[in-house]
Amino acid sequence: MLDIAMPKIEVVTAAENYGRFKIEPLDPGYGHTLGNALRRVLLSSIPGAAITKIKIEGVFHEFSTIPGVKEDVTEIVLNIKGIRLRSYAERPVKISLSKRGAGVVRAADIDAPSNVEIVNPNHYICTIDRDDAAIDMEMTVERGRGYLPADQRDALPIGEIPIDAIFTPVPKVNYVVEHIRVGQATDIDSLLIEIWTDGTIKPGDALSHAAQVLVQYSQTIADFNRLSTEAEPTTAPNGLAIPADIYDTPIEELDLSTRTYNCLKRADITKVGQVLEMDEKALLSVRNLGQKSMEEIRDKLIERGYIPRIGQTSHAARAEIEG
């Protein structure tokens, strides 16, 4: 295998929510290869925290109004989506807001535990325009990746309002590839990548995390031949063996809805084999994964031949039983 010259990384600009990084020298074509891959991972796979639902005292749905508050609930929800925070807890965390009397309500008025940090305390939420008015609100903070629409979650109790959760802390990434001269070669790539964050993560840390994600996926591919020859079939609860190639299939291959996919990912269920090892009771115990999502998973597994239809035995299952 030919050696690949390792590039150097230079920090061109380093700020709290903006960074420019130069990576060079790169073999011809590798500027776009790395730049595009890093950009996609930065925009989709960096973990973050967001408010996923709220409950306002005296309010039963998002189309309500609050006496003495200038904005209606729909506007308040839109403003809350802009609150950026860090959560150091693995589980959902409750934060609260209680404000009385005329005045502007900002993110700084939120009462949060020590494991939640609000990074834009001056963010505007609403205005109370009467001295005898008040707003009391409870919010739920969760960690996740990417974007989770409010309409792709299981039904909530009356009074709890779901919010589109923007988990990603990296809203924008640009990259430029230029040719530089190294010795006699004039077609060497130089990659300049710009990263904007929401302040909850430093651009350099985001770049490092994105690279680690790519390394993990690449390592799996690099180890493919060794793992495929060494791996022993896994046995599911129904007693049938799960071949290694099926076990290691990413759940993305099931083409699940965003809601169901995010439920599994948050529970660290990333492979089809992990799903096949779980019975219905175990699946329903996954947070926010309800009966509808469980049935969707079952239908997708049947559709791809991983499990037999009810009342039928698949070819693989029949061969296993007869053997």
UniProtKB/Swiss-Prot annotation:
This protein's UniProt keywords: DNA-directed RNA polymerase, Nucleotidyltransferase, Transcription, Transferase
One of the protein's GO biological processes: DNA-templated transcription
One CC-aspect GO term: cytoplasm
Reactions listed under catalytic activity: RNA(n) + a ribonucleoside 5'-triphosphate = RNA(n+1) + diphosphate
Positions of region (Alpha N-terminal domain (alpha-NTD)): 1-225
Stated role: DNA-dependent RNA polymerase catalyzes the transcription of DNA into RNA using the four ribonucleoside triphosphates as substrates.
Region (Alpha C-terminal domain (alpha-CTD)): 246-323
Protein name as annotated: DNA-directed RNA polymerase subunit alpha
Gene designation: rpoA
Family, as annotated: Belongs to the RNA polymerase alpha chain family.
Entry-linked Gene3D superfamilies: 5' to 3' exonuclease, C-terminal subdomain, DNA-directed RNA polymerase, insert domain, RNA polymerase, RBP11-like subunit
InterPro entries in the cross-refs: DNA-dir_RNA_pol_insert (IPR011262), DNA-dir_RNA_pol_RpoA/D/Rpb3 (IPR011263), DNA-dir_RpoA (IPR011773), RBP11-like (IPR036603), RNAP_asu_C (IPR011260), RNApol_insert_sf (IPR036643)
Top EC class of this enzyme: transferase
Protein source organism: Roseiflexus sp. (strain RS-1)
HAMAP family listed in its UniProt record: RNApol_bact_RpoA
Subunit structure, interactors included: Homodimer. The RNAP catalytic core consists of 2 alpha, 1 beta, 1 beta' and 1 omega subunit. When a sigma factor is associated with the core the holoenzyme is formed, which can initiate transcription.
A Pfam match: RNA_pol_A_CTD
UniProt free text on domains: The N-terminal domain is essential for RNAP assembly and basal transcription, whereas the C-terminal domain is involved in interaction with transcriptional regulators and with upstream promoter elements.
EC number annotated for this UniProt entry: 2.7.7.6
Origin: domain of life: Bacteria
MF GO annotations: DNA binding; DNA-directed RNA polymerase activity; protein dimerization activity
Key word Nucleotidyltransferase present: yes
